[in-house]
Amino acid sequence: MTSWTDFEQAEPELARRARGIISATTNCVLATIRADGSPRASGIDPFFRDGDLWIGSMPDSRKGADLARDPRIALHGIPWESRKVKDGAEDPGDGDVKITGRAVKLGDSEASARILSEYFAEIGVDEPEEGGDLYTIDLATVVVISVADDQLVVDRWSAVDGRKVVKRS
């Protein structure tokens, strides 16, 4: 499994940029795979805690059912122009982030409750009465896409192949 901490150790600058985009936005899109094989896109607010990137699902949600059946995910941090920056978050600059991997359900209910409680307190939201499921991401790829000098810059890291930067005019 490749955790966010593993990624940060391998590529600290790219990890900082990707984390900045995700942490600043209130709006990301998570793609999961439905039972019929078609994609499902869900709005989500991923967060970082204990060296990992986390996502959650509400009790009995379709997203949770998708992840139980097939844990493959894609996460897209919305481009800067179309998103709202969280209060107090640092401006991450231009670009968006795309992450692929597998959602790994946290089976420890006490750890899950602690992580969610800390997160809800941090964002100033009351904890829901019913719990849901909490997942960390086993990273496959992290891509930050930006524009520099009139070129599209695709900065891609893979757990298998490492980092590659491609510039397109």
Where are these regions (language model features)?
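Charged, gly/pro-rich active-site loop segments
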Residues: 1-13, 80-82, 87-169
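Short, conserved active-site entrance elements at the starts or edges of catalytic domains
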Residues: 5-32
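Structural motif corresponding to alpha-helix initiation and N-cap regions
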Residues: 15, 60-61
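Charged, amphipathic alpha-helical interaction segments
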Residues: 23, 42, 106-108
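Short solvent-exposed loop/turn micro-motifs enriched in small/polar/acidic residues
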Residues: 23-25, 38-39, 60, 96, ...
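Short beta-strand segments
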Residues: 25-59, 65-67, 74-79, 85-90
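Short beta-strand segments in beta-sandwich/barrel cores
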Residues: 28, 53, 73, 103-104, ...
